[in-house]
Design a protein with these regions (language model features):
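Flavin-dependent oxidoreductase catalytic cores
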Residues: 1-158
Length: 159
């Protein structure tokens, strides 16, 4: 028997096999971060193909943390209908779902996140999206760090 195809447990979660898909950027969300039909089709194809656990690509816990165009949003309840539809389709195909929560920090760009990028320190660094640019993020205050932590907690609750 091939152990790869046998069920496994992660805590109380039972997955149908040990094939796990890691998060990979697809840029299939719309410009605001809503799940689209293309997003659902992409993940559904992997679930139908036999993946036991799919980790959906990085979703930003706050708008200021979006670091790519067409990145999934999870920073507001308005994203829940699309995310719920995505998870329901993955489950219907027999797979389990998780999601990667991530804040772009100093790798965000004002034209994507809507404000000056933030990071633990204001150290310039190169970022490549469609062109190479140097980003100098705003140094986070203790209050801003606490706000990002709270945003992650709220996003985890939505997930």
């Amino acid at each position: 028997m091939n152990i790869l195809l046998t069920p496994a447990r992660i805590g109380s979660l039972e997955i149908p096999n040990r094939i796990v898909m890691p998060p990979m950027t697809t840029r299939t969300a719309d410009e605001e971060g809503y799940v689209t039909d293309d997003t659902v089709a992409y993940y559904l194809a992997r679930a139908q193909g036999g993946v036991g656990l799919i980790t959906v690509e990085m979703a930003s816990p706050e708008k200021a943390g979006r670091h790519r165009r067409r990145e999934i949003g999870i920073y507001d309840d308005r994203f829940l209908p699309g995310l719920t539809r995505l998870v329901d389709e993955i489950h219907r195909a027999g797979a389990k779902a998780s999601i990667q929560l991530g804040h772009g920090g100093g790798h965000t760009r004002r034209h994507i996140c809507g404000e000056t990028p933030i990071a633990p320190s204001a150290i310039p660094h190169p970022v490549y999206e469609t062109t190479l640019e140097t980003i100098v993020p705003e140094e986070m205050t203790k209050a801003r760090i606490e706000a990002v932590i709270a945003a992650h907690a709220a996003a985890a609750a939505r997930a």
